[in-house]
Structure formats: C-alpha cells, structure tokens
Amino acid sequence: MATYKDAGVNIEEGYKSVNLMKEHVQKTFNKGVLNGIGSFAAMYELGKYKNPVLVSGTDGVGTKLKIAFELEKYNTIGIDCVAMCVNDILCHGAKPLFFLDYMACGKLKGEVAADIVKGVSDGCLRAGCALIGGETAEMPGFYKEGEYDIAGFAVGIVEKENIVDGQDIKEGDVLIGIASSGVHSNGYSLVRSVIKDFREEFHGKIIGEELLTPTKIYVKPVLQLLKSYPIKGMAHITGGGFYENIPRMFKDDLNVVISKNSFPRPDIFEYIISKGIEENHMFNVFNMGIGFVLCVDPCYEKKIIEKLIEQGEKAYKIGHIEKGERKVIIK
C-alpha cells in the first residue's frame, strides 16, 4: 500500500518540527493571545482602543535565502521576514500586534524548520508582537532538497487620529535617516550576480555572513518617538531604494533632496560598487546605510536625533523637502 511518506511527505517529521517550534513560539505570547498552538485559527484580543484601525503587511525574504542555503545558516532569516513586514506597517504609525509565517520546502527537516522559526520568534520579540500562527508545507518535487521559501504576515494597530499618512508634509521639512544593519533583504539577485564566492574573506569574516546580517527592526525606537513627537511621514527603505520608497510618503507637488555625504556608507556597499555597479543605480536598489526615514518639522530635528541616539540608534539629518514633482534628488 502506498503511503504519504512514499510520496515524499513525512508526517512524523512534521509533528517533530511542531514540537521543536513550540518553545520559540510561546516566548512571543502576550496578554492579547487567546489560544495556543494547534487550533484551526489564532485569536487575538485587541484591548482598549477608542477608534482603532488595523494595519496589515505581508512580505518575504527574496533571494537572500540562496546565501542561507549555501552557508547552511537558518536561524536569522526569520528575523528578516518579520522585519520586512513590521517595518512596513510601522510607516503608518502602527504598533505590531501579531505575526503569522508561511514556510514551504521540498523535504522537511525538523531541526531546520525549528531554526527558521526561532528566527521568526526572535524577530517578533524585537518587534514586540506575538507569533500566533503559521504553516509549514512539505512539497516534494516543487523545491530542491535543502531549499525552502518563507513569507510572513503582520497585523498592527493605530488609533485613527494617530495614523501617519504624509498629508502634512510641506516644503522645508527635514528627513532623518536611521542607520541600517547592512544590505537588509533587498537587492540580493543583483548581489548574487556580482559576488560569486560567499566564503571570500571580508573584514575578518566571510562575506556570506556579512550578507546574512539580519534586517534591523525599527519598531521600538520609532514607537517611542511617536509618543512625544509629531512625525509627518515615514519610509522603510526596501526594494527600489531611495528613489522608489521615499516618495511613497509625500504628495505629488514635492521633491526630496538627499545629501549622499550626510551619512556613513557601510563597507559592504562600497564593495558591491567595486564589482561594477554604478553608484546612482545602487541608490535605486539598496538602502545604502539608511534603513528607515522620518519626515519632521525642522524644530524637532535635533531632539529626535538625540532621542534615537539615546536608544542606541545611529541617526542623521539626510535631506529636506522642497517644491517639485514627486522626485528624489540625490547629490
């Protein structure tokens, strides 16, 4: 008699992976979580809000995964998955409430799946949200053995009156950039086209390890700022770099002027440029050292930068808003 295992799906390994994941998942639970692992759906209590708006976002990690496969390093890629989602919803002032993950692979290995979920759990702890559900799909013949894909879904909340939507951004406002931790989770197809040996030495470690540095999660420091300062707009610098992401936070009759020498550029970006990528194209693909941007009135600039530094972040005035046609000018 044929079995599911004969077809390439190991149910026992699935049970094993769930048991290994439980510890990591439960670490993220907070008072809003109403049920545990194993139910058909997850439930979350909102608590006391006057006029709440739910804010959602979904994303993956892209071809950064290919480097993780090659180095067999699985425990940080989940942080990237969380970061890509929670940083996006943060742009509208939302506090992340909960997160769900989806992982698919050709052949399930319990320890690897648990390692990946540990990263998701670590990311949720950094973001202050609960990992309340997920799906692990074993799909023989669909993925190569040793390869997998991961995606996530975040839901946050903000009082309607506190939504950050960029409507008040005007000429003369300034942009504050918060430093990234490295390349983050975008542009890896380009990276992989110019870097062929991920075990090459780079500043005392192999370059693959540098490229796997987890995406920074900006939730806690930015939510602290929102308690005290009126931030007009925010942008998460992801795919499309400065040119595509910064205009998403302001109106059509404005330009943003960025001073490219106003912040330090991590060595990894100089290394990628040395492989034959034009600098201007880099700003259209990568974060170039700035992972999150705030738009504020100039009177708050110094206080906000000081507050970010107090919280352990590196922050810089990187540009300003002027009249224009919704363009980004980098000079």
Curated annotation (Swiss-Prot):
Protein's name in the database: Phosphoribosylformylglycinamidine cyclo-ligase
Protein keywords: ATP-binding, Cytoplasm, Ligase, Nucleotide-binding, Purine biosynthesis
Species classification: Bacteria, Bacillati, Bacillota, Clostridia, Eubacteriales
One Pfam family named in its UniProt record: AIRS
Coiled-coil stretches: none
GO cellular component labels: cytosol
Family: Belongs to the AIR synthase family.
InterPro entries (alphabetical): PurM-like_C_dom, PurM-like_C_sf, PurM-like_N, PurM-like_N_sf, PurM_cligase
UniProt subcellular location: Cytoplasm
EC number: 6.3.3.1
UniProt organism field: Clostridium tetani (strain Massachusetts / E88)
Reactions accelerated catalytically: 2-formamido-N(1)-(5-O-phospho-beta-D-ribosyl)acetamidine + ATP = 5-amino-1-(5-phospho-beta-D-ribosyl)imidazole + ADP + phosphate + H(+)
Pathway this chain belongs to: Purine metabolism; IMP biosynthesis via de novo pathway; 5-amino-1-(5-phospho-D-ribosyl)imidazole from N(2)-formyl-N(1)-(5-phospho-D-ribosyl)glycinamide: step 2/2
GO molecular function, one term: phosphoribosylformylglycinamidine cyclo-ligase activity
